[in-house]
Curated annotation (Swiss-Prot):
Residues 1-63 form the TGS domain. Belongs to the class-II aminoacyl-tRNA synthetase family. Its EC number is 6.1.1.3. GO terms for molecular function: aminoacyl-tRNA deacylase activity; ATP binding; metal ion binding; threonine-tRNA ligase activity; tRNA binding. This is Threonine--tRNA ligase. CDD domains: TGS_ThrRS, ThrRS_anticodon, ThrRS_core. It comes from the Archaea. Binds 1 zinc ion per subunit. It comes from Natronomonas pharaonis (strain ATCC 35678 / DSM 2160 / CIP 103997 / JCM 8858 / NBRC 14720 / NCIMB 2260 / Gabara). The keyword Ligase applies.
């Protein structure tokens, strides 16, 4: 039998016989690792420990100490849910039940479920877990699989699509129950330490609104009860911080039915925050020599065909028939920027050319996937596109990486970095992709950053460096990105004249410092619980006159000393206590209480939103501090602490 080379995470290599399994490799490394093996990651794909290796590959062994273990555990918990459901409701038909970032779900039909049903199903799940049934992989012929699912159109659809080339097909069994599944799974149901069913929602088969409506049951699972309890506490805190709730309470944005789903309206408070975010990155771009451009919201589809978006992205585009000609709302800004570049005659002396645009784009997400600002139809990207010579790639990407770090550090956000490689659906040659991936890997290596490889997660036109940042609740969010593109310059025939007086092809770099304003805004709302840093807050100071007699002094303070800031006067005839509480509820960073004593002395009493207070403060002293706090973009108001 032929030999294959298996590359391990530390770079070491093992020669194994073709057909060896993941578990075989683990035992070759050591008997203890072999005993502990749960699954494997082969070339970035999570697989069963019985997966046979037939070609040279990169392999990560998964044990119960691995990051991937929880994903495997939750996949098994989804099977336990499905078994429990069918024990209690044999008429239920199963669709799909994958693990998710926070747990798992299973789409089912043929049964009406409510909260009481979930309680009973959860109790049955506990029975199955306590029984500690072995979970075993089994192979069935296609004919047998179709017989098993004679009355289940969803499993038959899977057999006819994803599993169309498989014979035999993979099943997993536990006790007397089985499910069509690629795995992997833990060894027995008893490994699942704690489960909880969370909620019920509606879903469409394949995410297509034209298909049948299914019932989606969400749940989660952990190794221990304490881990589950911690998750549930964080989940409750997340509900309190939900940006949809705070967006309404703080009058930041709305998505009314009349406008359509996924189409947010920004109120003055929300737009004030967005303008600060825009000004911040615009200044960073200006400092690095970017030129600001603007492109229309729609183009002829000829442009999208030229760019490759029509071929690769048409299902996610909004298309319009205008005078018998097809147009498309732009899902990305890059083709417009490439077209602008193509209008000029460029020399190597002109490069790099850097374009920036806060450009609105439109992507047709399924209605069921839309959620607040996190998934919308219309959103704005702080897009930057650079056209550079090949030998300038690393220098430019390093500058972009510095910009991204400055943005995330400004908001005190921890982050992780990943190199996303070629997806299955892509444009361009193998040579071009390999060159692009090598360039980005070189940048990451020289930066000294720790980074992961996300195989197959690149854009269809090139590999990318992705930043994921962590919020106050420990959740990870997709954020800034840097993408190399050797393909679009080819498609648009972009050229510049080199030092040798010959035409050359520039490299295009795509870059976003936030990712999208909508998602970044959403994360900031929840990360800060609406308590934005003073420089970002829609209302930075609220002046609270003790009585109507002090309103004139309040206006004088606002107009003479604080006219450069976002300041409001609370002039309603309320008690001071109610005025303070209202300002606190509105998350205003600073409150200035002014009564007869302050007016006579020409001072203010300063309170911050943490209910700390300083009395008899000179107005100019407060103003100067406020100016420096805003200029330095400090995360917390800190005047009272000085």
């Amino acid at each position: 039998m032929s030999e294959i080379v298996v590359t391990l995470p530390d770079g070491s290599e093992l020669e194994m016989e073709s057909g060896s399994t993941v578990e075989d490799v683990a035992y070759e490394i050591g008997p203890g690792l072999g005993d502990d093996t749960v699954a494997g990651v082969v070339d970035g794909e999570l697989v069963d420990k019985a997966e046979q290796l037939t070609d040279d590959c990169e392999l990560v062994i998964v044990t119960d100490q691995s990051d991937e273990y929880l994903q495997v555990l939750r996949h098994s918990a989804a099977h336990v849910f499905a078994q429990a459901l069918q024990r209690l409701h044999p008429e239920a038909k199963l669709a799909i039940g994958p693990p998710t970032e926070e747990g798992f779900y299973y789409d089912v039909t043929g049964v009406d479920l409510d909260a009481d049903d979930l309680e009973a199903i959860e109790a049955e799940m506990e029975t199955i877990i306590e029984a500690d049934h072995d979970i075993e992989r089994a192979e069935r012929s296609r004919e047998e699989a179709f017989e098993i699912y004679e009355d289940n159109p969803y499993k038959r659809d899977i057999l006819e699509t994803e599993a169309a080339d498989e014979d035999p097909v993979s099943f997993y069994t536990q006790d007397d129950w089985q499910d069509l599944c690629q795995g992997p799974h833990v060894d027995s149901t008893g490994e699942i330490g704690a489960v909880e069913l969370l909620n019920i929602a509606a879903a469409y088969w394949r995410g297509d609104e034209d298909n049948e409506t299914l019932t989606r049951v969400y749940g989660t699972a952990f190794e221990s009860e304490s881990d589950l309890e911690g998750f549930l506490q964080r989940r409750e805190e997340a509900k309190k911080r939900d940006h949809r709730k705070l967006g309404q309470e703080l009058d930041l944005f709305s998505i009314p039915d009349v406008t359509g789903p996924g189409l947010p309206l920004y109120h003055p408070n929300g737009k004030a925050v967005l303008r600060e975010l825009e000004d911040f990155v615009d200044q960073l771009n200006d400092d690095q020599g970017y030129e600001f451009v603007e492109t229309p919201h729609l183009f002829r589809t000829e442009l999208w065909k030229q760019s490759g978006h029509y071929e690769n992205y048409v299902d996610d585009m909004f298309l319009l028939d205008v005078n018998d000609e097809e147009y498309g709302l732009k899902p990305m800004n890059c083709p417009g920027h490439a077209t602008i570049f193509n209008q000029g005659n460029w020399s190597y002396r002109d490069l790099p050319v850097r374009y920036a645009e806060n450009g609105k784009v439109y992507r047709k997400e399924q209605r069921g996937e839309l959620s607040g600002l996190s998934r919308v139809w219309a959103f704005t990207i702080d897009d930057g596109h650079l056209f550079v010579e090949r030998d300038a790639i690393e220098q430019e990407v390093n500058v972009i990486m510095d910009q991204i770090e400055e943005v995330l550090d400004t908001f005190d956000l921890d982050y992780e970095v990943a190199l996303a490689t070629r997806p299955e659906k892509s444009v361009g040659s193998d040579e071009i992709w390999e060159q692009a991936q090598t360039q980005l890997r070189s940048v990451l290596e020289s930066s000294g950053m720790d980074y992961d490889i996300e195989s197959g997660d690149g854009a269809f036109y090139g590999p990318k460096i992705d930043f994921a940042f962590e919020d106050a609740l420990g959740r990870n969010w997709d954020g800034p990105t840097v993408q190399l593109d050797f393909n679009m310059p080819e498609r648009f025939d972009l050229t510049y004249t080199g030092e040798d007086n010959e035409e050359h092809r520039p490299v295009m770099i795509h870059r976003a410092l936030y990712g999208s304003y909508e998602r970044f805004f959403m994360v900031l709302i929840e990360h800060f619980d609406g308590n934005f840093p003073t420089w970002l807050a829609p209302e930075q100071v609220r002046i609270l006159p003790v009585s109507d007699d002090n309103i004139g002094y309040a206006k004088q303070l606002k107009n003479r000393y604080l006219d450069d800031f976002r300041v409001e006067i609370e002039d309603r005839s309320w008690t001071v206590g109610k005025k303070i509480q209202t300002a606190h509820d509105d998350r205003v960073p600073y409150m200035l209480v002014v009564g007869d004593n302050e007016e006579e002395a020409g001072t203010v009493s300063v309170r911050d939103r943490f209910e700390d207070e300083r009395k008899d403060v000179d107005v100019e002293t407060f103003r100067d501090h406020l100016a420096s706090e805003v200029e330095e973009k400090r995360v917390e108001p800190d005047f009272v602490d000085e």
